[in-house]
Amino acid sequence: MILDDLVAVTKIRLARHQRQQSLADLKQTVAKMPRNHKPDFLIRLKQPGLHVIAEVKKASPSKGTIVTDFPYLAIAKAYDQAGADAISVLTEPDYFNGHLHYLKEISQQVSVPTLRKDFTIDPYMIYEAKANGAVIILLIVAILTDQQLRDYRQLAEKLGMHAIVEAYTAAEVTRALQSGAKIIGINNRNLKDFRVDFTNSLKLRAMVPDNIPVVAESGIKTQEDVEKLAAAGFNAILIGETLMRSNQKKQLIAAFKERA
């Protein structure tokens, strides 16, 4: 399964990073960071309308290289100027061609919150996200225990961050809710085989109480898709490949927000 492979290479990468910088040193780096002055992501999600999380992504396991020309800073700035509510940055290098320095540089250059899009399997990676400018992390229910979901979310909040707790099945939505998730992501992509079913998020939306913001992820391509998600009561959409392939990124974000 692709997800198992992703977790395996993440463990190898984590061990390498831990050898390069100890957790104690990383904590010191985080402790010295200035206070974050970007808009609060959770408060923004609770405001009316459908919010857009625009993703900076060069490649994926299912599509390979999405774009060869990858001016990541210019892309992120265009998202920011177009009114994106947050910017997701892939930092997974082996399958997504991501890197932590993309996150750090983008976080320094944009006015909106940034999300570290990665496979968080250890508290070290949460401190690492914070040290590189992220104010949002992703916690994937399928790769974490119930205790980890709770502990990692609480650690993120202690560091002044928010966690999107991502589910793909009804059972995972239940686990996300039981863990105390304050933001839930419903993925249309099955991370085990990377197949996409756009209706997945629509089927599971009703499981989440209205007081908890919900983000629809993956397979969102058209204005019609966006309208369906808005009508179903989603608070936000995360869009990656569709934006990365577009030559009119600003116009596309504006159109999605307007039609919603």
UniProtKB/Swiss-Prot annotation:
Keyword Protein transport applies: no
Stored Gene3D superfamilies: Aldolase class I
Molecular-function GO term, any one: phosphoribosylanthranilate isomerase activity
Keywords (A to Z) from UniProt: Amino-acid biosynthesis, Aromatic amino acid biosynthesis, Decarboxylase, Lyase, Tryptophan biosynthesis
A GO BP entry: L-tryptophan biosynthetic process
PANTHER family, alphabetized: INDOLE-3-GLYCEROL-PHOSPHATE SYNTHASE, TRYPTOPHAN BIOSYNTHESIS PROTEIN
Catalytic activity: 1-(2-carboxyphenylamino)-1-deoxy-D-ribulose 5-phosphate + H(+) = (1S,2R)-1-C-(indol-3-yl)glycerol 3-phosphate + CO2 + H2O
CDD domains: IGPS
Any Pfam family the entry gives: IGPS
Alphabetical list of NCBIfam families matching this protein: PRK00278.2-4
Protein name as it appears in the record: Indole-3-glycerol phosphate synthase
Pathway(s) where this gene product acts: Amino-acid biosynthesis; L-tryptophan biosynthesis; L-tryptophan from chorismate: step 4/5
SUPFAM superfamilies, alphabetized: Ribulose-phoshate binding barrel
PROSITE patterns: IGPS
Transferase keyword on record: no
Gene: trpC
Database matches in InterPro entries: Aldolase_TIM, Indole-3-glycerol_P_synth, Indole-3-glycerol_P_synth_dom, Indole-3-GlycerolPSynthase_CS, RibuloseP-bd_barrel
Enzyme Commission code: 4.1.1.48
Similarity comment text for this entry: Belongs to the TrpC family.
